[in-house]
């Protein structure tokens, strides 16, 4: 493949073509300095994005300025609302199916698997799986909301590639930063924290982000900065208050549906 790797080239390609070009050029990058072989591809991808990042972000920002900017508050609000409403719709569909399945288990399962099933406690049977599933699914929602900003690249959305341990790439202070984006400051357990340090540590300008400034930090590394809540959203020029308001409405809607299903 003789196509030159440049931001201008990638911009004109489809996501599939971008992925193919990045895969080829990434394979040419020496990664023998990275001890953990599981992170070789992530390191190569990171080097590729670092090389084209500034120009790619410049294109995104200029494109946004030429049109009615997504950073205008009304536009931001509409885009965030669209994503949270779609999330609520899809999660409520899953919730109804889950309740139906759990109800069937309680009514027809001759061999209960736990005390809650034995006692027919429908709400207790479903509550753990619901909150666990909700927390997991919301992880991608933060990426989708962040991706509204022209100062953010989500590699999976933009290039069709997954960089192990990296959720978003952002530009701030004229630097390209590679970040993990979690829901809360205490999202990671001890073993997960150690893995995150390795995954972030292979990149220049790593960053650990909590979407909301809630709880206590479980991630701590002197070489990897961490930010939370409004500080992060301000960094990518999105209005934190809008995000919090739309998330509140979304979760209240899901909570109301959960309560109605439990009452049946």
Language-model features: locations:
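A residue-identity detector for tryptophan
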Residues: 56-59, 94, 142, 188, ...
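Long, charge-rich low-complexity segments
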Residues: 68-92, 179-204
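Amphipathic alpha-helical interaction segments
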Residues: 102, 150, 240-241
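Noncatalytic linker/hinge segments flanking ATPase motor cores
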Residues: 119-123, 206-210, 218-223, 247-254
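Catalytic centers of nucleases
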Residues: 136-199
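Catalytic cores of nucleic-acid endonucleases
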Residues: 183-237
């Amino acid at each position: 493949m003789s196509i030159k790797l440049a931001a201008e080239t990638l911009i004109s390609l489809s996501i599939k073509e971008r992925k193919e070009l990045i895969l080829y050029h990434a394979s040419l990058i020496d990664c023998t300095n990275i001890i953990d072989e599981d992170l070789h591809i992530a390191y190569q991808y990171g080097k590729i994005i670092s090389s084209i990042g500034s120009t790619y972000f410049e294109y995104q920002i200029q494109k946004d300025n030429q049109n009615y900017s997504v950073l205008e508050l009304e536009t931001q609000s509409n885009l965030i609302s669209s994503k949270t409403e779609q999330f609520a719709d899809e999660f409520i569909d899953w919730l109804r199916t889950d309740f139906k399945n759990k109800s069937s288990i309680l009514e027809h399962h001759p061999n209960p698997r736990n005390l809650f099933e034995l006692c027919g406690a429908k709400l207790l049977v479903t509550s753990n799986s619901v909150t666990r599933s909700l927390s997991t699914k919301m992880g991608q929602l933060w990426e989708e909301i962040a991706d509204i900003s022209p100062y953010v690249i989500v590699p999976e959305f933009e290039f069709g590639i997954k960089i192990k341990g990296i959720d978003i790439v952002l530009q701030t202070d004229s630097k390209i930063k590679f970040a993990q984006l979690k829901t809360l400051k205490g999202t990671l357990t001890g073993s997960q924290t150690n893995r995150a340090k390795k995954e972030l540590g292979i990149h220049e300008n790593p960053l650990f982000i909590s979407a909301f400034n809630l709880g206590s930090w479980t991630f701590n590394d002197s070489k990897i900065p961490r930010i939370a809540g409004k500080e992060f959203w301000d960094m990518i020029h999105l209005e934190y208050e809008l995000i919090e308001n739309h998330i509140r409405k979304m979760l209240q809607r899901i909570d109301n549906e959960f309560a109605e299903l439990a009452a049946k």
